[in-house]
Amino acid sequence: TWDNYRGQVDTGGPLNDSGTIRGRAVVTEQTRQYFYDVASRKDQIYYGALDFDLSPDTTLGLGMAYEDVDATPCWGGLPRYADGSDLHLKRSTCLNTSWNNQRSKRATYFADLKHQFNDDWSLKVAGVYSRNTQDMEYAFPSGAVPVGATASNTLMLGSIYDYDQRDYGFDAYVDGKFDAFGQQHELTVGANASRSHKDDFYAVAALPQRQNVLDPNHHIPQPDESYYLANASRGGPVDMHIKQYGAYSIARLKLADPLTLVLGSRVSWYKSDTDSVQYFRGEGTQVDTKSTETGQVTPFAGVLFDLNDNLTAYASYTDIFTPQGAYKTIDGSTLKPLVGQSYELGIKGEWFDGRLNSSFNLFRTIQKDAAQDDPRCEDSSCSINSGK
């Protein structure tokens, strides 16, 4: 297990005699080493939740989660000879430095309110806030090794990253059942919104000392922040604001006892604003970008046919629309949204009151402009839109 140790305490239950107040608390800690050099990781996770029955029909839930990670990661992979052949390095080889460090903390607070109007209709309202901070510094090799070399003089790239992101989310929906044309149908109608603010700084620079990947030195001198600013091939501060709003509905219409038609749609609004400075060899260039999508409609349709009490055949279609404003190009601008279509055909089964489930599915997904790493950025810090 490579010195992998994990402990967890998980407790919960009613907190009063009537059971109208319930709670759960979880504490987890894990420390581990790895089979490759240098790397290690320590995780601490805390979770707590309370449920309050305000009335027989209304329940309020409150909770929080916290995660703290302190790691020395091994990033960047292993190079090859210039002709693409294997270097035959030891399985334990890591070419990073001992001062590689990742420190991240995430705190999440959430609340939800559920109300049952009657046997058929209910309301749920939920909100969440989270803050994620990360401080990282790492070095990794870049470039191939000359064929037949017994030593190498491989370029080492260093990177620093200071990250602070705050996210707010809200969702509310009503769902229920209604009778029409001699059948019972289901309907869900809702709306949601989210807001995100990311404030970060990063820089990537070639380190003064190179690496012999055939005999790694894990103690290459660690530069200070001023070195990165003066020698950065790219980097700088980034201040990003993203807002999303949407309304959605889905109806499950019973056309006959074995046949159900599912129709749904979402209307989305999206806006992102990014202010950044791109550094190159100590010189900074201001880059400001904006992205807006208004009233984007994403439909969904499906049909289900009950073959018997256990098996259901189905087919579905949906449009794909995913904003990608969080991805930035090498010049600091944002990517176009990912768009496309998805088709699915299959059979699903359920036995023993849901204790055993099975499915067989065929998918066809067509995507355009999905984000992918830009090969001009060795540390995968920038992206480009892919083709179709």
Q: What is the meaning of each model-derived region?
A:
Residues Y109-N132, M156-V277:
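Face-selective signature of the C-terminal outer-membrane beta-barrel domain
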Residues D112-Y138, D306-D309, A313-Y314, P337-K388:
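Membrane-embedded beta-barrel scaffold of Gram-negative outer-membrane proteins
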Residues D51-S55, Q165, Q184-S196, V238-Q367:
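Structural signature of Gram-negative outer-membrane beta-barrels, strongest in the C-terminal barrel
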Residues T1-G48, L54-T58, A107, F352, ...:
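Outer-membrane beta-barrel translocator/receptor signature
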